[in-house]
Amino acid sequence: MSTEHKAKAVHFNVDTALSVTTHSRPLRKKSQIPTFSSPRAYAIAMPFDEMLARAKKENPDVQKLIDERGLRQEIAAVNLMVAKLCDKACEIWPNAFMVLVDERYFRAPLQCIGLADNTHRINRTLPTADELQQIRDRLDINGAEFKLGWYRDMYPDQHI
């Protein structure tokens, strides 16, 4: 017995061959994430004073708690407000996350709403301009103080 196998040519009927041909798909241009030497997050800056004012407006008891407990309560109120806004942003952009960015861009470390990062594979896509505008409108953050950009991420492993 021979263990040698010979390849056989396969021929299709002309009608079958035409139905098997693949059709080209439209090419979608993907947004490219720039290369950085350190962990960065594409985020919308949420200014501390603005977030504190929103927290006080949403819940008048916040001011009383701040008077009793001081700066720690202010920080907690701002973090809670940013978390709520992040949840709203997730309705439009599911990859949204809270991120703490480096103080070299602001006068203190700042909580931001992250939309993409250069550290995690699942967060490497960027929202479209239309999605960004929807997020800004939904969160009412259209002012110049809500800057969008690539910021140094202080704790990249905490927002997976």
Regions found by a protein language model. Name each.
Residues 125-160:
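Acidic, proline/glycine-rich low-complexity IDRs
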Residues 51-54, 65, 77, 81-88, ...:
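Charge-rich, solvent-exposed alpha-helical interaction surfaces
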Residues 59-60, 69-70, 86-94, 124, ...:
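Short, flexible coil/linker elements and helix-boundary hinge sites characteristic
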Residues 22-30, 99-101, 133-138:
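Intrinsically disordered, low-complexity boundary segments flanking structured domains
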